[in-house]
Amino acid sequence: MNSNIIKSIDIIPNNNNNNNNSVSTVNTNSSVINNNNNNNYNNNSISNGNNERIKVFIVHGHNNIVREKVSKFLFEMGFEPILLFEKPNNGQTIIEKLEKEISNCKFGIVIMSPDNKAFTKKDSNSDYVEIAYPRLNVVFEFGYLIGKFGRSNVIYLSVPYNGKSQNYDLPSDLLGYVWINYTEDLKELENEINFGNYKKL
């Protein structure tokens, strides 16, 4: 068995016998997560050598369903997903809070979703056409993660728009960046993590 895999979850049962839909509490090293009986979390952790889960920073836009699905998936894989809005402000500016939380992580996942729409044209003689594009803070944080971790430690997860992946406008600097498709089973994300070096960071 891999020595980096540790048990880190305790299930605290609900002792209320009058409630048929009992809810258990999952205690992790860093947070408390409510878990009903239909969700079985993996109780193995990817350790960084100090009996702590490897932290991964998640950049996201307004697609809350995808955000929560990816976060839960990473937790089940043994990582500690970090979402900026869940962390206390402690009087910090947004950029200070961003810098602090990213500095504690080993790699990042950018969920690129087409949250905004605008009109553009290719040249002065063209008609305006409607385009979708990610929120600008997502693009900014994408670049920040690349500068912090390097391209090899930043996973670009593309949420389809009108049935096509990366079917939205991006800065030209990012057009050559290889992305993986978001799917309901997150299989491509799982393969990227398993076959990459993310568990050894």
UniProtKB/Swiss-Prot annotation:
SUPFAM superfamilies registered for this protein in UniProt: Toll/Interleukin receptor TIR domain
Source organism, top-level taxon: Eukaryota
Induction and repression of expression: Up-regulated by phagocytic stimuli.
Biological processes per GO annotation: signal transduction
One GO MF term: NADP+ nucleosidase activity
A Pfam family per the record: CAP12-PCTIR_TIR
Ranges for domain TIR: 52-186
Name of the protein this chain belongs to: Protein tirC
Protein's organism: Dictyostelium discoideum (Social amoeba)
